[in-house]
């Protein structure tokens, strides 16, 4: 990825003429966009590049051209769906992520684990979890990370209604945060949450 340029004081993350994707053809083309503090949504149909954009923003996918500028702190991005994580326990996942984020909130993690019914699963390997519970492992870490920028890919997929409501409540509060950004990629944006920006792909 190109060397980041100084970031505007208005934004905690921004792109300049960013192009890239997982294959030879870029799903994201010449994207110039800025994300301020608050809650943001990236919408699009299947195959439009939602996940690719999050990976580009996180530095998990190299850009073909353009640049990403991030405020001097940290970005949370984690994908625990791959088979390489199957043998890792829930607690081990959290333990591995914790040192990367200096503002990690262990008390919040405990509260979220309780709210999302994951406390009893801490010692289980990820391969033993349902798709929804596996997603909760990432979500709990993301929300407890304290990262300046948190990237969430389809956070409600395969979740039970109680957990969806708990995540929605958290994001409603996050929308008012003065210095942190949550960027969510999903098919549709919620109609009852105050968004700082909405980007359609």
PLM features: residue spans?
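A short, flexible loop at the N-terminus of ABC-type nucleotide-binding domains that lies
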Residues: 1-37, 62
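ABC ATPase nucleotide-binding domain signature region
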Residues: 41-44, 52-99, 189-191
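Conserved ABC ATPase "signature" region
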Residues: 106-121
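Conserved ABC ATPase signature
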Residues: 125-132
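Hydrophobic anchor residue at the start of the ABC signature
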Residues: 139
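A short, proline-enriched helix->beta-strand linker immediately N-terminal to the Walker B motif
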Residues: 144-148
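ABC-family nucleotide-binding domains
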Residues: 153, 159-160, 164
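Conserved catalytic loops of ABC-family nucleotide-binding domains
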Residues: 170-192
């Amino acid at each position: 990825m190109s060397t980041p340029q100084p970031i505007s004081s208005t934004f905690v993350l921004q792109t300049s003429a960013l192009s890239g994707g997982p294959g030879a053809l870029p799903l994201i083309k010449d994207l110039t966009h800025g994300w301020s503090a608050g809650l943001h949504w990236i919408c699009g149909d299947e195959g439009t590049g939602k996940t690719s954009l999050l990976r580009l923003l996180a530095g998990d996918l190299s850009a073909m051209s353009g640049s990403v500028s991030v405020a001097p702190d940290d970005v949370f991005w984690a994908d625990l769906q791959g088979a390489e994580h199957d043998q890792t326990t829930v607690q081990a996942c959290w333990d591995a992520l914790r040192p990367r984020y200096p503002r990690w909130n262990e008390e919040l993690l405990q509260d979220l684990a309780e709210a999302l019914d994951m406390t009893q699963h801490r010692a289980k390997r990820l391969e033993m979890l349902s798709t929804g519970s596996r997603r909760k492992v990432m979500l709990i870490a993301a929300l407890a990370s304290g990262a300046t920028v948190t990237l969430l890919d389809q956070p409600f997929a395969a979740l039970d209604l109680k957990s969806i409501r708990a995540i929605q409540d958290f994001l409603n509060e996050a929308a008012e945060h003065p210095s942190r950004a949550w960027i969510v990629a999903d098919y549709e944006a919620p109609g009852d949450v105050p968004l700082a920006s909405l980007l359609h792909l």
